[in-house]
Amino acid sequence: MILWKSLSCFSFVFGLLLYSASFVCAGDIVHHDDSLPQRPGCNNNFVLVKVPTRVNGSEYTEYVGVGARFGPTLESKEKHATLIKLAIADPPDCCSTPKNKLTGEVILVHRGKCSFTTKTKVAEAAGASAILIINNSTDLFKMVCEKGENVLDITIPVVMLPVDAGRSLENIVKSNAIVTLQLYSPKRPAVDVAEVFLWLMAVGTILCASYWSAWTVREEAIEQDKLLKDGSDELLQLSTTSSRGVVEVTVISAILFVVVASCFLIMLYKLMSFWFIEVLVVLFCIGGVEGLQTCLVSLLSCFRWFRRFGESYVKVPFLGAVSYLTLAICPFCIAFAVFWAVKRQYSYAWIGQDILGISLIITVLQIVRVPNLKVGFVLLSCAFMYDIFWVFVSKWWFRESVMIVVARGDRSGEDGIPMLLKIPRMFDPWGGYSIIGFGDIILPGLLVTFALRYDWLANKRLKSGYFLGTMSAYGLGLLITYIALNLMDGHGQPALLYIVPFILGTLFVLGHKRGDLKTLWTTGEPDRPCPHVRLQPQSS
């Protein structure tokens, strides 16, 4: 069907262009920024700070701020943080000695024109136990020391709040209410169960897609052998039909992928906004509907109750021949995608996003094929360099990681682009999500599905084939990605940096050891005996 093929190609390009690195999407709570000045007394890491408040003794709101490069470190547990009364500075910027007397209160000040260290020293000299600085915008600014300043004598914590949080507290205090608060910076757990589930989700997606792809190819091969044995004229028609919905990656397209994907990523980076995210949501819904419909139709067709509807077709204007089963399932898929798009800001929306995403990935891995190891090597090598460049190297040109900024949607006011699988971090005091980009599943998955197709066509057992090795290599590479993620305090990691060497290395080593490397590299299919040979009588 023409529409199905065009949507399949769209799904492939869409899935590849919009993939991102694997990283925790809660906002890094620890920033090791070596580009900003450090010296004794001014070498703290930038950490996010929780500020739970009480108004007249009742729990109110919890705000989030950021700590300064200087001053003492904060407690990591709420039970150890002291509940302290909040006071407003007079003058508001605290650049000169406050008129009001302080006896251990936390002082709320405006950013003003003097340095952060100056106002901190003034507040400390006036008797403040901590200082909250209201920023001029909703962003959190990194508070550093000025050149030549002596900060060794600063002994009170310094925290910056966004302007909306600061003004809210200021208005409450001005209304003569008694505001008390705590300051603490909880640490993230070394491992969150969300990462385990995300690992299982990624591995399971490739596993399902691989067996579906291999089963389809084997059925085509069996049917082809049967027609060839019978000498049927339907052989040519079968070859044309079987390849109609398949997109084969070539060396040229693998190389062009890096160029096109890089241009698209820069466009996303420059044009990122609320409305641009809305466009991406619409595109994701289109791909998700196609993927979910394809998966459901194929799954239900395995049951005899639905098989008859899946094999009966009706002509639909502009669409061509469509099965009755597809017509019945399509409205449900559209309704599901629309429901997710409308409710995507809710806490449970990640479930719908993952269902649509997994369906899209499985469909792409079913219709897109790597013909041989040579193409797979070029594709993964290009993606390997692409991932590293846009996660790490781009920081030197753009002063921030382009890949991570795009994936998190930092400039859009949204939670990030929808082309991600994500699971909420269940035991993380900061919340957020563990996420993985589509490309970190699709690109390695293309080579894993290729390995299983080769094994089935060559009648190899699981232990003697290549699928078990490549599948294990992917799982191990992804596991090391999460280890690196935790070692780097949640900073974004290019998953392909760890996955690609494992997968390619496994295929090359096993192929060389078993003598199949030349076949894997060139044809990508094992030599199979012609059915006619078995039918020829032996000459006496």
Swiss-Prot record:
Residues 89-170 form the PA domain. Its EC number is 3.4.23.-. Its main location: membrane. Glycans are attached at residues 56, 135-136. One of its GO terms (biological process) is proteolysis. It comes from the Eukaryota. GO terms for molecular function: aspartic endopeptidase activity, intramembrane cleaving. A motif (PAL) lies at residues 494-496. Glycosylated. The keyword Transit peptide does not apply. It is found in: Endosome membrane. Keywords: Endosome, Glycoprotein, Hydrolase, Membrane, Protease, Signal, Transmembrane, Transmembrane helix. Residues 217-248, 292-321, 369-372, 453-464, 511-540 are cytoplasmic. SMART domains: PSN (SM00730). The chain crosses the membrane at residues 196-216, 249-269, 271-291, 322-342, 348-368, 373-393, 432-452, 465-485, 490-510. The active site is at residues 387, 440. Belongs to the peptidase A22B family. The PAL motif is required for normal active site conformation. This is Signal peptide peptidase-like 4. It comes from Arabidopsis thaliana (Mouse-ear cress). The lineage of its organism: Eukaryota, Viridiplantae, Streptophyta, Embryophyta, Tracheophyta. The gene is SPPL4.
